[in-house]
From Swiss-Prot:
Location relative to the cell: Secreted
GO biological process, one term: hyperosmotic salinity response
Binding site for Zn(2+): H38, E182
Coiled-coil residue spans: none
Record-level GO cellular component terms: extracellular space
Function of the molecule: Growth hormone plays an important role in growth control and is involved in the regulation of several anabolic processes. Implicated as an osmoregulatory substance important for seawater adaptation.
Protein name as it appears in the record: Somatotropin
GO molecular function: growth hormone activity; growth hormone receptor binding; metal ion binding
Disulfide bonds: C71-C173, C190-C198
Similarity comment: Belongs to the somatotropin/prolactin family.
């Protein structure tokens, strides 16, 4: 009887531990999603403010340029479209999000925003790193070979009225990448929860 009670106690304790780990995991995912949503909203606001300050002719000209432009993050392998995102593993979504955030580590310093975007990105990157470590149970999360090239020179340009094309490109790419990360983290969070419906 005593042995049965000991075994039962161990089982109950393990269940509580597992449940606690699940709650902590969800808390970390919630925090990461909230942070990237804030960054995405901030990027959209900066983009709107920038476009409102343009003359109609300038706005028309720039809207034709960006679809043909190349973002720094385009060199990062990432799920394309809803179907591919849905089929990607949680670990792949986290790795991709980590690399996208990392790609803005230096360019973000030129966004000229008083809200310390670089610090917000650094905090989010750290949080995603913790989530990756949790997914791989302490194994190496990112290979050294996965480190990618420094941002293109264009991305080091500061926002200025005399450089509308580069400023527009910088803001457009930032908004685009924050949207990507928000999507990837939201799907990853859903996958790690009890919700069985994670459609986009």
């Amino acid at each position: 009887m005593a042995r049965v009670l000991v075994v039962l106690s161990v089982v109950v304790a393990s269940l509580f531990f597992s449940q606690g780990a699940t709650f902590e995991n969800q808390r970390l995912f919630n925090n990461a999603v909230i942070r990237v949503q804030h960054l995405h909203q901030l990027a959209a606001k900066m983009m709107d403010d920038f476009e409102e300050a343009l003359l109609p002719e300038e706005r028309k000209q720039l809207s034709k340029i960006f679809p043909l432009s190349f973002c720094n993050s385009d060199s990062i392998e990432a799920p394309a479209g809803k179907d591919e995102t849905q089929k990607s593993s949680v670990l792949k979504l986290l790795h991709t999000s980590y690399r996208l955030i990392e790609s803005w580590e230096f360019p973000s310093k030129n966004l000229g925003n008083p809200n310390h975007i670089s610090e917000k990105l650094a905090d989010l990157k750290m949080g995603i790193g913790v989530l990756i470590e949790g997914c791989v149970d302490g194994q190496t999360s990112l290979d050294e070979n996965d480190a990618f090239a420094p941002p293109f020179e264009d991305f080091y340009q500061t926002l200025s009225e005399g450089n509308l094309k580069k400023s527009f490109r910088l803001l457009s790419c930032f908004k685009k990448d924050m949207h990507k990360v928000e999507t990837y983290l939201s799907v990853a969070k859903c996958r790690r929860s009890l919700d069985s419906n994670c459609t986009l």
